[in-house]
Amino acid sequence: MIVVLKHNVPEEKRNQLINWLKAQGLDVHPSLGEYQTVLGLVGDTSRLDMSLLESLEIVDSVKRVTDPFKCCNRKFHPDDTVVQVGDVRIGGGNFVMIAGPCSVESEEQIVYVAKAVKAAGAQLLRGGAFKPRTSPYDFQGLHEQGIRLLEIAKQETGLPIVTELMNIKHLPLFENVDVIQIGARNMQNYDLLKEMGSVKKPILLKRGLANTLKELLMSAEYIMASGNDNVILCERGIRTFDDYTRNTLDLAAVPMLHELSHLPVIVDPSHSTGINRLVPPMTLAAAACGADGVIVEVHNDPIHALCDGAQSLTCEQFAEVARKVRAVRKAVAE
């Protein structure tokens, strides 16, 4: 249920209503907009008298929300959420480029790539330290050493770092990580999602390879209902019957998610295609369809990469894509 308050309601009266609603056993999520305030109610609202609420002088309207996701629902929070990562704002009309290697391999590699992507316009550095691989025989990442190397790259460049958390026992290693990524394979690891609710860091939540948008939003709901509103959604391709690309990039999900939710939505053109020559056009398509950013894999020597070299751009290719993204964003804005 949502309660829309009239314009310019005094704070004292608003708080009186919020406290009364909490006394009814409900969680209240206020969204203070420029022109109206919306109170999102989570819990058993079946016994609330809608006509009584509507009769209050400070209430404009009351609506029941049938969607199972509440906290991330745009009806609860009409304005776009902007996730702040240092000086970087994700959402609210900004377009953020997150770039870096699939896996951290060495100090020389990660520092070189970090400097290159920053020079090209990337605002955040991605890099895998713990790698979930389909085969147990593939490179699994440098683990704790990989985190330390990311921290060195952060010190060298000032770029905030994004890396994947697979197991809650590794969380103490992530103290200097700026954005924690929950990968596609863990999108429905509900115990892990609930733990992310108590983490005071932004969470980048990737859509699972066979999950619906509702399931993605319900996973975001787990994090938000547990106390962390700083969630970034990521469309990274879904499994379909076609096998020319690794996955099928569902770009229609971007405007649909923006319609359903107030959370920022970014796109992963690397994992969704699996082919580096397809990454540039899909990056531009993401910029054109209204995404709030992209997360792109970049490697200084893709042919010899220990992980996913086939989908990685060279530093020079990324610089060219970043230049074109700026042109697309300008054209879309006009």
Question: Language-model segments: what does each one mean?
Answer:
Residues 1-97:
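Non-catalytic terminal accessory/regulatory regions of metabolic enzymes
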Residues 96-101, 125-127, 161-163, 180-182, ...:
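Hydrophobic faces of well-ordered beta-strands that scaffold small-molecule active sites
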Residues 85, 224-286:
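Active-site/ligand-binding-proximal alpha/beta "capping" segment
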Residues 126-144, 300-312:
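Glycine-rich, proline-tolerant flexible connector loops at the mouths of alpha/beta enzymes
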Residues 95-112, 136-140, 160-164, 183-185, ...:
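Active-site mouth loops of central-metabolism enzymes
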Residues 129-133, 186-252:
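Conserved anion-binding
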Residues 139-163, 195-202, 251-265, 311-333:
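Alpha-helix-loop-beta-strand connector modules within alpha/beta enzyme cores
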Residues 121, 173-181, 197-203, 224-230, ...:
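Glycine-enriched alpha-helix->loop->beta-strand junction motifs that scaffold or abut catalytic
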